[in-house]
Amino acid sequence: MSATLPDVAVTEAFTLSAPLRWVGMQDIAIPVHLDAASGSGLAARASVQVDLPRAELKGIHMSRLYRLLDLHLQRPLSPAMLPQLLQALIESHADCASRAARLTLSFALMLRMPALRSEGLSGWRAYPVRIAAQCRAGRTTIQLQVEVLYASTCPCSAALSRQLLSDAFVQQHAWCDALPLQDVAQWLQDHGSYATPHSQRSVAQVCVDLPADTQGFAIQELIGLCEQALATPVQAAVRRPDEQAFARLNGANLMYVEDAARRLRKQLAEHYATFHVAVRHLESLHAHDAVAETGSDDETFFPAAL
């Protein structure tokens, strides 16, 4: 049947000829399976392309890319499977002289996270994940990117707030040489919020190169490393004891955007040879955001964009 249908990509002449670096599709809706027991899989968005070196050809075969993507992603996703998929994409376009292929998969990984203090209480967190793979000249590179939300409290604002509180205490008790401990505690209970530092939800985007011999993506492990370094990840289900514990964590981990970037750099350098970090504080004091970027000394890939 298809033999009788017109194919203008083959039959129609065209006047513009040039090789193309990448041609393909993006934002394809497709499920991915992180393990064999994941059932219907995670809802993902895929982008897939090959190069088109033959300048005289009008275009590539989009349907071949789609069918191969669909076929391979019916299997559990793994670092070992991605080179096979990329090579299949290249081979499917031998008539186009394609030598390179690339793929990105984006999805949200749902993780149940325990509350800080309340026993038996937990809630769901959605972590944006992006896996990018590229094959060129027989060499495959794989990158894993995760996004982590955390709270940041400004050290400068905290110092200014402490000064205001101290000044208020001195002003109200200038007449007294000594105060009972209970009176001091009661004053702090009544006036401890005389001034409060500004804090805000913040986002860290971390991208790492995965070694060629890696056995798994270890997505949860990477998320755990980031949250451990930052110490103030946003919470899901909370009761008052959990909220109080979160306030304590923020007080013990005051940080500028520079501090957050350096914390992540130190943590990741102990586990990955090549990585990139981009952090953004959605300032509650300002109408703009504060940002910082860093990476490994041998960082070779383009920085992530928040």
Curated annotation (Swiss-Prot):
Enzyme class, broadest EC rank: hydrolase
Keyword Hydrolase in record: yes
Annotated Gene3D superfamilies: Urate Oxidase
EC numbers on record: 3.5.4.16
Annotated pathway: Cofactor biosynthesis; 7,8-dihydroneopterin triphosphate biosynthesis; 7,8-dihydroneopterin triphosphate from GTP: step 1/1
Molecular function GO terms recorded: GTP cyclohydrolase I activity
Site (May be catalytically important): C154
Reaction catalysis annotation: GTP + H2O = 7,8-dihydroneopterin 3'-triphosphate + formate + H(+)
Name of the protein in its database record: GTP cyclohydrolase FolE2
Entry keyword set: Hydrolase
Protein task: Converts GTP to 7,8-dihydroneopterin triphosphate.
Keyword Hydrolase set for record: yes
